[in-house]
Amino acid sequence: MVRINENYLKLKAGYLFPEIARRVNGFLAENPNAPIIKLGIGDVTEPLPAACREAMAKAIDDMGDRANFKGYGPEQGYAWLREKIAAHDFQARGCDIDASEIFVSDGAKCDTGNILDIFGKDNTIAVTDPVYPVYVDTNVMAGHTGEADESGKYGGLTYIPITADNDFVAQIPTEKVDLIYLCFPNNPTGATATKEQLQAWVDYAKTNGSIIFFDAAYEAFITDESLPHSIYELEGAKDCAIEFRSFSKNAGFTGTRCAFTVVPKNLTVTASNGQAVQLWSLWNRRQSTKFNGVSYIVQRGAEAVYSEAGQAQIKTLIDFYLENAAIIRRELQAVGFDVYGGVNAPYVWVKTPAGLSSWDFFDKLLINCNVVGTPGSGFGAAGEGYFRISAFNSRENVLEAMKRITTAFQ
């Protein structure tokens, strides 16, 4: 008899974004001419930077030339890209990260799930609430949780609320946890963490022998110079943290696929036999076995991000989306919405009006305004009564969406 991984049966309904798509498609089936504007899923809309396109075009020519053709590349990524990442994203900010500690991949989403391959099932796990659903769902799939309760919380997980009631600060848990997921700038709330706040987490992790999974996919949107871009800016973080980054949002690589994970070589855990085990070695083994690397063409495009032209072009992209976020904040606040985030992050977190549930507000915006956002409850129980609006869209669409919403709620 064939057995399935029955942990999948514990997953609550559909993954958040497919459920949004189901509702939108149902509405469009009845209203095929509705001018839908999507400010929900965090997908970019603006073209790839010219520097990246030109580098990829040249790489395509390389693939057509026997002398420059590339077959299988290093599973960890080409050295020339890893060296650029180390120099520009870490060493330039005072972080002692070596190129060999960087693993290039096809997405931070994939890596935050795949990293569980090198950890056992008996770890205690902490996530913020609300939270990027992938952190929770991948742990459910891997058998690290119990069943979900009526609020959607899974047994075996420690939930750390980040809401307006605590100024969106992730409080250190009173109990000991082994694996900690942190994402700053935060998805979905748009909240940021100060150096002092992150240092407290690093100190907690070192004291308790914990590992922090730090998702910095949105660090490029930080404009406040006092805020850390990497957890490795904090003292001791190399001893307790793995960081995930992506080219998806800063360089528009959502459809091109390139990211990277940093696993410091001095990061160790103790095996059941008392032996200290290097996590870098485990992750390197995992990637070498299960991953064939990102394509040469895409990696050349990612390398171009670090050129002088590339840096200028991605700054233009980031500024564009941040201005969209500023417009969303300003327009919604003008008609009385309580609005958070959207300053050092591309997401605006909105309190739903008149006591509406997150999904009721979703339906109201869809039906009355033909605008799609993301229900806060889809990110966890503490997200109920909130709504995420993404700045990733054209200026024209953002302005039109705000016009529709402010007209409906003024």
Curated annotation (Swiss-Prot):
Binding annotation for substrate: Y15, G42, K109, Y132, N187, N292, R388
Transferase among keywords: yes
Co-factor requirement: pyridoxal 5'-phosphate
Pfam families listed in its UniProt record: Aminotran_1_2
Enzyme Commission code(s) on record: 2.6.1.83
GO biological process: lysine biosynthetic process via diaminopimelate, diaminopimelate-aminotransferase pathway
Residue numbers binding pyridoxal 5'-phosphate: Y72, A108, K109, Y132, N187, Y218, S246, F247, S248, R257, N292
The keyword Transferase appears for this protein: yes
N6-(pyridoxal phosphate)lysine sites (modified residues): K249
InterPro entries in the record: Aminotransferase_I/II_large, DapL/ALD1, PyrdxlP-dep_Trfase, PyrdxlP-dep_Trfase_major, PyrdxlP-dep_Trfase_small
Involved pathway(s): Amino-acid biosynthesis; L-lysine biosynthesis via DAP pathway; LL-2,6-diaminopimelate from (S)-tetrahydrodipicolinate (aminotransferase route): step 1/1
CDD domains: AAT_like
GO molecular function, one term: pyridoxal phosphate binding
Keywords: Aminotransferase, Pyridoxal phosphate, Transferase
Enzymatic reactions: (2S,6S)-2,6-diaminopimelate + 2-oxoglutarate = (S)-2,3,4,5-tetrahydrodipicolinate + L-glutamate + H2O + H(+)
Record's subunit section: Homodimer.
Protein family (similarity comment): Belongs to the class-I pyridoxal-phosphate-dependent aminotransferase family. LL-diaminopimelate aminotransferase subfamily.
Function: Involved in the synthesis of meso-diaminopimelate (m-DAP or DL-DAP), required for both lysine and peptidoglycan biosynthesis. Catalyzes the direct conversion of tetrahydrodipicolinate to LL-diaminopimelate.
Protein name (Swiss-Prot/TrEMBL): LL-diaminopimelate aminotransferase
Native source organism of the sequence: Picosynechococcus sp. (strain ATCC 27264 / PCC 7002 / PR-6) (Agmenellum quadruplicatum)
